[in-house]
C-alpha cells in the first residue's frame, strides 16, 4: 500500500505542472499482421501503454515526458518493459498533425532476466477529430534480450486520446 501511495505522490506534480495529458495505446504492426523472423506469428500481442505529459508551448513545439509500459507475448517468453521517454513535439507545422522525437531508457524483463534498454522514437500523429488521433511510431531500441543485434526496429500503430 505504501509503495502505491509513493508512486501516486510522485505523479501528482507531473499532472499539476503539465499543460496537457494524453493516453497512448499502440500495437507492433508487423507482429499484428504478418509476424517476424523469430517465429512469432501474425496476431502476436505486443501492446504499449503510455501517458504523455506536455510542457508549455514554445513557438512551434513543446517538451514532453512519456512514461511507457510494454507487454509482448513472444515465442520463447513474455517481455515486459518500462521506459521513461523525453522529447519534443512539433505541432504547428501541419494542421492536425504532430511530429514527435523522443529518447528514453528503462528496464525490461524477459527469460527470467532483467536488464536495461535504450530507445529512440519518431512518431507522427494525425488528429482525425478533436482530441483523438491515429499515430505511427518508428522505434529504434537496444535490448539486452536481442542477441547479435545492437539495435532493433519496431513500427507501431496506435491511438492517442487527449485527456486535458
Tell what function each PLM region has.
Residues 1-22, 164:
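Cleavable N-terminal export/targeting peptides
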Residues 17-64, 69-71, 156-164:
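Short glycine/proline- and aromatic-enriched beta-strand/turn motifs that initiate or cap beta-hairpins
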Residues 19-27, 61-67, 82, 97-103, ...:
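Transmembrane beta-strands of outer-membrane beta-barrel proteins
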Residues 26-34, 68-72, 87-89, 104-110, ...:
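Outer-membrane beta-barrel pore domains and translocons
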Residues 33-39, 71, 120-164:
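Predominantly the C-terminal beta-signal and adjacent terminal strand-loop region
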Residues 41-47, 78-82, 114-118, 149-155:
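Residues that define the transmembrane beta-barrel architecture of outer-membrane proteins
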Residues 48-52, 85-89, 121-123, 158:
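Outer-membrane beta-barrel architecture
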Residues 53-59, 73, 90-96, 126-132, ...:
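Outer-membrane beta-barrel strand-turn architecture
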Amino acid at each position: 500500500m505504501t509503495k502505491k501511495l509513493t508512486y501516486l505522490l510522485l505523479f501528482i506534480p507531473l499532472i499539476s505542472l503539465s499543460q496537457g495529458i494524453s493516453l497512448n495505446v499502440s500495437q507492433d504492426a508487423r507482429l499484428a499482421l504478418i509476424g517476424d523472423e523469430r517465429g512469432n506469428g501474425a496476431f502476436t500481442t505486443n501492446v504499449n501503454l503510455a501517458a504523455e505529459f506536455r510542457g508549455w508551448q514554445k513557438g512551434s513545439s513543446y517538451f514532453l515526458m512519456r512514461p511507457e509500459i510494454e507487454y509482448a507475448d513472444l515465442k520463447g517468453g513474455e517481455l515486459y518493459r518500462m521506459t521513461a521517454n523525453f522529447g519534443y513535439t512539433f505541432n504547428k507545422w501541419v494542421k492536425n498533425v504532430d511530429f514527435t522525437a523522443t529518447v528514453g531508457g528503462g528496464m525490461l524483463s524477459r527469460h527470467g532476466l532483467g536488464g536495461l534498454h535504450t530507445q529512440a522514437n519518431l512518431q507522427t500523429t494525425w488528429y482525425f477529430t478533436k482530441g483523438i488521433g491515429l499515430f505511427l511510431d518508428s522505434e529504434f531500441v537496444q535490448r539486452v534480450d536481442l542477441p547479435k543485434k545492437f539495435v532493433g526496429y519496431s513500427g507501431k500503430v496506435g491511438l492517442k486520446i487527449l485527456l486535458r
